[in-house]
Amino acid sequence: MSSSLKDKRSVLRKTIHRLRTHYNCAVAEVDDHDVWQSAILAVVTVAANRAQVDSLLAKVMHDLETASDFQVVEQELEYL
């Protein structure tokens, strides 16, 4: 857990880099930029079919949920 914006940004930088490196997805912090207690991340991917998207996002969520440096409180999926 972070106790300052500097700590939060360090954790996010490492997490975003890990997700981008291990999975074929784009990741960005989309809200709560200046709130050290929380972060809102968006993970985006494109695939030939929905099953591939579901599989990748399930792996990403598992990665995030098993991380020890933060806690996933809520998730939301949107398909376009």
Each PLM stretch: what is its role?
Residues 22, 40, 74:
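Broad gene-expression machinery/nucleic-acid interaction feature
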Residues 25-31, 72-74:
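A short linear hydrophobic-aromatic micro-motif
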Residues 7, 40-42, 56-58:
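Surface-exposed beta-strand edges and their flanking turn/coil or helix-capping segments
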Residues 11, 18, 33-36, 70, ...:
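A generic structural micro-environment signature
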Residues 1-21, 26, 63, 67:
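N-terminal first-folded block
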Residues 45-80:
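C-terminal structural segments of small proteins and small subunits
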Residues 1-7, 33-35, 48, 79:
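A broad, low-specificity signal for short, low-complexity segments enriched in glycine/proline
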Residues 28-49:
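Short, charge-patterned binding micro-sites
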